[in-house]
């Protein structure tokens, strides 16, 4: 994890995906646009675009559930995490950008 990741409170996306997969009841949220999501996303991720982030309540009803949020580079996920926390969610993590994910993407 680099200095900027620490500065912007981001967790390494590869570690976070492992944590997501190992945690029952956790959610992985992709806040990119629909076309970006369809072009390639992490298996198990739910697409809730940043401009529709308020719809997260349709997917994550438990405000204490672990929620991992990513985008393309980490900027939109940072914005989304702030917005989700403002909605009352307690356990939300910015995991940065899918551009740093080393695993295979679902297309």
Predicted regions, residues:
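Short, surface-exposed ligand- or partner-binding patches at beta-edge/loop junctions that are enriched
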Residues: 70
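N-terminal glycine-rich beta->alpha transition that marks the start or flank
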Residues: 30
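Rhodanese-like catalytic fold shared by cysteine-dependent sulfurtransferases
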Residues: 2-19, 23-26, 34-66, 75-107
């Amino acid at each position: 994890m680099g200095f900027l990741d620490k500065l912007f409170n981001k967790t390494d996306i590869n570690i976070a995906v492992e944590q997501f997969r190992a945690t029952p009841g956790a959610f992985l949220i992709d806040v990119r646009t629909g076309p970006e999501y369809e072009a390639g996303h992490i298996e198990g991720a739910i697409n809730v675009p940043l401009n529709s982030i308020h719809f997260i309540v349709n997917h994550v009803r438990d405000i204490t559930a672990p929620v991992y949020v990513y985008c393309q580079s980490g900027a939109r996920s940072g914005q989304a995490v702030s917005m989700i926390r403002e909605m009352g969610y307690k356990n939300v993590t910015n995991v940065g950008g899918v551009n740093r994910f080393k695993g295979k993407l679902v297309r």
